[in-house]
């Protein structure tokens, strides 16, 4: 049975449990749940905060000015401590992890997007759990409130996840600030993220991390618009991850816009002018339009323009009609060499391969 793909984002407050350092017993409990789901067949991706807190603790809480450079220093020192903590705990269950350090630019740049996506899918296909963090040590503008909330939404789109869990120190989204109003009520389900929902999100957060409730609402908006159900839930609740995966009602659930699932992803992917043209034969045209298939090198007749792997190009028929936009797996130089050839010849011709297809069907949008 194919189980769903879930992205789980852990805020600093969840990993530290209010202390100035990573809370190992709590992380052990988190890993136990993820190991259970992993062994049950779920595909789990972790987006982890905590590098800055880990770095501050490792350096014995140095007095540093509140600057970008100070945060980068702490992140550079703390990232190795953070990944070691995850690695040691997963090793108890004989589960391997793979670290990816990303910035938003890595996902917005199409060639790097493809590389990141291929790496993530390779890890998941080989039963390795990806552990992702913002590359705070080299990022500049990216170090701001909500980095990993927003990053987790983009990662969820990247891996085509069914669900995104944003685990935090709050029970979910309330109709007012529960720390100020004891009568505040938890909102169990949000059908649509409206201005009213944004207005009640407030500005919660701790000085250990960089996140708050408003950034989670923004992340939920991005994810649900791409067809990904998003849940804000308490990271300290016993068995919260496993219970969410098995569909218990916890926290605040943001309903996915299922009708827009594929289209919104493609709008996100293809918001760029075309960099070239790939002309295809009648067989490839039929495969794409009638059979919903990917484009193989054998079906390519001509390649126009100079473009990189992952840039948007037009797919044109022999009669001159543009039938699709898409992101090729290979750059223009490589496609010139493999056009008209069988997929089995790719590695022999190029000396490498990014798979058997020139352009995957998931990376195309058909033009009406």
Swiss-Prot record:
One Pfam family in the UniProt entry: PUA
Enzyme class: transferase
Localization per record: Cytoplasm
Family to which the UniProt record says this protein belongs: Belongs to the glutamate 5-kinase family.
Protein name: Glutamate 5-kinase
PROSITE patterns given in the database record: GLUTAMATE_5_KINASE (PS00902), PUA (PS50890)
Binding residue positions for substrate: 49, 136, 148
InterPro entries registered for this protein in UniProt: AceGlu_kinase-like_sf, Asp/Glu/Uridylate_kinase, G5K_ProB, Glu/AcGlu_kinase, Glu_5kinase, Glu_5kinase/COase_Synthase, Glutamate_5-kinase_CS, PUA
Keywords for this protein: Amino-acid biosynthesis, ATP-binding, Cytoplasm, Kinase, Nucleotide-binding, Proline biosynthesis, Transferase
GO biological process: L-proline biosynthetic process
Cited function: Catalyzes the transfer of a phosphate group to glutamate to form L-glutamate 5-phosphate.
Any one GO molecular-function label of the UniProt entry: ATP binding
Annotated NCBIfam families: proB
PUA domain: residues covered: 275-353
One Gene Ontology term, aspect cellular component: cytosol
Domain of life where this protein originates: Bacteria
Main location: cytoplasm
Reactions catalysed, as given in the entry: L-glutamate + ATP = L-glutamyl 5-phosphate + ADP
Pathway: Amino-acid biosynthesis; L-proline biosynthesis; L-glutamate 5-semialdehyde from L-glutamate: step 1/2
Record-listed E.C. numbers: 2.7.2.11
SUPFAM superfamilies from the UniProt entry: Carbamate kinase-like (SSF53633), PUA domain-like (SSF88697)
């Amino acid at each position: 049975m194919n189980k769903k793909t879930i992205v789980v984002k852990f805020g600093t407050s969840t990993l530290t449990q209010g202390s100035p350092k990573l809370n190992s017993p709590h992380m052990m409990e988190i890993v136990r749940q993820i190991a259970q789901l992993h062994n049950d067949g779920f595909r789990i991706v972790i987006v982890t905060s905590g590098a800055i807190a880990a770095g501050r603790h490792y350096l014995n809480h140095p007095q540093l000015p509140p600057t970008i450079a100070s945060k980068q220093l702490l992140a550079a020192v703390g990232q190795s401590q953070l990944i070691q903590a995850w690695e040691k705990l997963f090793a108890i269950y004989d589960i391997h992890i793979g670290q990816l350090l990303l910035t938003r630019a890595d996902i917005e740049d199409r060639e790097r997007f493809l590389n990141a996506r291929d790496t993530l899918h390779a890890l998941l296909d080989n039963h390795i759990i990806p552990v992702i963090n913002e590359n705070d040590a080299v990022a500049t503008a990216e170090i701001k409130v909500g980095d990993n909330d927003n990053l987790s939404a983009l990662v969820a789109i990247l891996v085509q996840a069914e669900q995104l869990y944003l685990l935090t120190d709050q029970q979910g989204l309330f109709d007012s600030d529960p720390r100020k109003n004891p009568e505040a009520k938890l909102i169990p389900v949000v059908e649509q993220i409206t201005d009213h929902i944004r207005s009640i999100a407030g500005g919660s957060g701790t000085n250990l991390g960089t996140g708050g409730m408003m950034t989670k609402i923004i992340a939920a908006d991005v994810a649900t618009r791409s067809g990904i159900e998003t849940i804000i839930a308490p990271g300290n609740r016993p068995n919260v991850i496993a219970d969410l995966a098995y569909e218990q009602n916890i926290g605040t659930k943001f309903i996915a816009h299922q009708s827009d699932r594929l289209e919104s992803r493609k709008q996100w992917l293809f918001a760029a002018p075309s960099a070239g043209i790939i002309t295809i034969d009648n067989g490839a045209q039929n495969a794409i339009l009638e059979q919903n298939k990917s484009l193989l090198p054998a079906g390519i007749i001509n390649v126009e323009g100079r473009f990189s792997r992952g840039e948007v190009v037009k797919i044109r028929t022999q009669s001159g009609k543009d039938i699709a936009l898409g992101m090729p797996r290979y750059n223009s130089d490589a496609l010139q060499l493999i056009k008209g050839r069988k997929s089995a010849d790719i590695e022999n011709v190029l000396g490498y391969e990014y798979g058997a297809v020139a352009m995957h069907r998931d990376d195309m949008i058909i033009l009406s």
